[in-house]
Design a protein with these regions (language model features):
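Positively charged, amphipathic and often flexible ligand-engagement surfaces
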Residues: 2-416
Length: 416
């Protein structure tokens, strides 16, 4: 394992009138990793190293998909590696220990039933019932501030693609689309009745128009008193900053609150590959700098309109997190949340939570075999973000070095 190196970050804050807390960086590792043994830290380091290799990642993902197709017993391997790192458990009951441990550090939990790509009415109904259970769980537990769902858990991908393309639906498809809208309405109505905000995840650009339609319809109905329904905006798309501003204008004109989760995006390679294959301009910004610029501009826009917007900054980017933290006049602003994925960005989550900011971890769960598509996507996304994964490795190295130094100092004191 390479020698650990010190990392620091210093960025100018967003403009603000006054500040009660000024964060300089996210270099502190002790609190972020204190619940991990030295052995576990080394296991995590090797996992991130494998994920940081595009070749190994590609081969591993292909092998895992092949094993699933052949119905090979891969669950034990997945459970001991990717699942252990990025999931809270297989059931709600198994997630309780994770929820409690995070709550001890003032970090909330967003339970994410991470089953993707359902294709049957029975499967869609099961996902709907699970999301409703998560809303009930959140109502009963203050450590769970949001519920969340993916529309592809409630509807066929092909149907969402056709609706998004504004194609004429057959009578059967029209009935199917009505069913999808009814499922979303059941979830969002339950969320409003329970006073539990619910986030709708963003997905591929060619089905996103249908998701946006469902989200905005639900906001008009349920966000009259406060933001209950949150749509997710992926700022790696060229058009999303303008879309955010258009949504705000609509909310302002129609008298409802806009709820948004701001993310950079999770389907970059897939989006670019499809655009190249079908011969249309990629909807994704050509550079990371362009994405960062739009992401930070989106945060700045939301901060300027907190009387009408509630938002969650879903980011592992230290610069964006520092800027937002240092821009807030009070850490625990009721309309602002930070969020990172479970198993990643702990140095950001724990530092923010220790200073009183609203922080929540996205905690995926579900049966191991059913969440493998999510885990593969997470591994592939991390491989595309090699700089970030390298940062996770270096933080683990820094914590191991810190422990070794502390152990040596303690030993020397004992000898003296």
């Amino acid at each position: 394992m390479p020698e650990a190196t010190a990392i620091s970050s210093s960025v100018p804050p967003y403009p603000t009138k006054g500040q009660s807390i000024r964060l300089k960086n996210f270099d502190e590792t002790e609190s972020a990793f204190k619940h991990h043994s030295n052995r576990r830290l080394r296991q995590m380091w090797w996992l991130f190293r494998l994920m940081n290799s595009p070749t190994l990642n590609r081969w591993g993902s292909a092998a895992l998909r092949l094993a699933m197709r052949w119905h090979l017993p891969v669950e034990p391997i997945v459970k001991a590696t990717l699942f252990r790192q990025f999931c809270g458990g297989q059931t709600l009951e198994e997630c309780q220990a994770t929820i409690a441990r995070l709550a001890q550090a003032n970090i909330k939990t967003i339970l994410d039933y991470a089953v993707e790509g359902e294709s049957t009415e029975e499967g869609f109904e099961q996902v709907t019932q699970t999301v409703l259970q998560n809303i009930a769980q959140a109502k009963a537990n203050p450590a769970i501030p949001f519920a969340v769902f993916k529309v592809t858990g409630l509807a066929r991908f092909e149907l969402l693609e056709k609706v998004s393309a504004r194609k004429v639906l057959t009578s059967e498809e029209e009935a199917e689309w009505q069913q999808v809208q009814a499922r979303v309405a059941r979830i969002t109505t339950a969320a409003e009745q329970a006073a539990v905000p619910v986030m709708i995840d963003a997905e591929e650009s060619w089905i996103q128009a249908a998701i946006d339609e469902l989200a905005m319809k639900a906001m008009r109905q349920h966000n009259r008193q406060r933001a209950i329904v949150f749509n997710t905006i992926q700022l790696y798309r060229r058009d999303r900053l303008a879309y955010l501003k258009a949504c705000y204008a609509e909310a302002e004109a129609e008298g409802f609150y806009l709820g948004v989760k701001l993310v950079r995006g999770a389907y970059m390679e897939k989006e670019r590959a499809r655009a190249a294959k079908l011969g249309y301009p990629s909807p994704i910004h050509p550079t990371k700098a362009d994405t960062d610029k739009d992401y930070n501009a989106a945060i700045e826009f939301c901060l300027a309109h907190l009387d009408r917007i509630a938002f969650c900054a879903g980011t592992h980017n230290e610069e964006s997190s520092l800027k937002l933290a240092n821009a807030l006049e009070t850490p625990a602003h009721p309309n602002v949340y930070f969020s990172q994925l479970y198993g990643m960005g702990d140095h950001i989550s724990y530092t923010l939570a220790a200073h009183g900011f609203n922080v929540a971890k996205y905690v995926p769960y579900g049966a191991v075999r059913k969440v493998i598509p999510y885990l593969l996507r997470r591994a592939e996304e991390n491989s595309a973000l090699s700089g970030y994964v390298s940062r996770e490795q270096r933080l683990i190295e820094a914590e191991i070095a810190r422990r070794q130094k502390a152990k040596k100092c303690k030993k020397n004191l004992h000898v003296d």
